[in-house]
From Swiss-Prot:
The active site is at D8 (proton acceptor), D131 (proton donor). It catalyses: 1-(5-phospho-beta-D-ribosyl)-5-[(5-phospho-beta-D-ribosylamino)methylideneamino]imidazole-4-carboxamide = 5-[(5-phospho-1-deoxy-D-ribulos-1-ylimino)methylamino]-1-(5-phospho-beta-D-ribosyl)imidazole-4-carboxamide. It is found in: Cytoplasm. CDD domains: HisA. Coiled coil: none annotated. This is 1-(5-phosphoribosyl)-5-[(5-phosphoribosylamino)methylideneamino] imidazole-4-carboxamide isomerase. Its EC number is 5.3.1.16.
């Protein structure tokens, strides 16, 4: 089970939003590269970056901070990024800079042809981000709810060749209410590619619950507010996940 620390970037700083609201941002660090180093030193095996300004602007807005993070840890672990990725040129720029994966969210839902082109051009590097509330997909930084069922879109995107899916339960993100395990497993069982859970991770029991369903295709979980607020000790959580994986593998 991959525990993936999130570094959300707003105006060059590492922040956390409450339910996607740019006006409800808590600044956790003015040095995102130092934050990346901290998580890697604590045992992170992948990082999840979000360009929040980019997500709302539709184009890269935190390049300097992203490049600083890649300079710091990009040679050591894979780094993935979402937010504002709307063109093949942007993807190419990011991958050339050292990102391992780019996450396409709103653009995948609104313009499936773009996602298909991206999967063809950058095979193995494209992750789809599906944000949902009550099983329905949301777009545009969560401000718009669509009529699309998450599972239907996930199957379609799997056929395009996406590497994996980051699934966020909007109702729980940044609220420390616990991961929506049932919805995540349902999605993972419906597709043959890995699913990364996101939204609401709050404590060690959440990690333990996710490890129990890893066999269904839940590859990892994005750790956000809980590791910044201190509700979850990242190093202890990764250690526990590794212990559980060992126990399950030996069972």
């Amino acid at each position: 089970m991959l525990l993936i620390p999130a570094i959300d970037l707003k105006d060059g700083q590492c922040v956390r939003l409450k339910q996607g609201d740019m006006d409800q941002a808590t600044i956790f660090s003015e040095d995102p590269a130092a934050m990346a180093r901290k998580w890697v030193d604590l045992g992170a095996r992948r990082l999840h970056l979000v360009d929040l300004n980019g997500a709302f602007a539709g184009k890269p807005k935190n390049l300097e901070a992203i490049e600083a993070i890649l300079d710091e840890v990009g040679d050591e672990i894979p780094v993935q990024l979402g937010g504002g990725i709307r063109s093949l040129e942007t993807i190419e720029k990011y991958l050339d800079a050292g990102l391992s994966y780019v996450i396409i969210g709103t653009a995948a839902v609104k313009n499936p042809g773009f996602l298909q082109d991206a999967c063809t051009a950058f095979s193995g590097s494209i992750i789809v981000g599906l944000d949902a509330k009550d099983g329905k997909v949301a777009t545009d930084g969560w401000s718009k709810l669509t009529g699309h069922e998450v599972i239907d879109l996930a199957k379609k995107f799997e056929d395009y060749g996406v590497e994996s899916i980051v699934y966020t339960d909007i109702g729980r993100d940044g609220m420390l209410q616990g991961i929506n395990i049932d919805a995540t497993v349902k999605l993972a069982q419906a597709v043959g590619i890995p699913v990364i859970a996101s939204g609401g991770l709050s404590n060690l029991p959440d990690i333990e619950s996710l490890c129990e369903v890893e066999e269904h295709g839940v590859e990892g979980v994005i750790c956000g507010r809980a590791i910044y607020s201190g509700d979850l000790d990242f190093a202890a959580a990764q250690k526990r996940a590794d212990e559980l994986n060992g126990e399950l593998d030996n069972a």
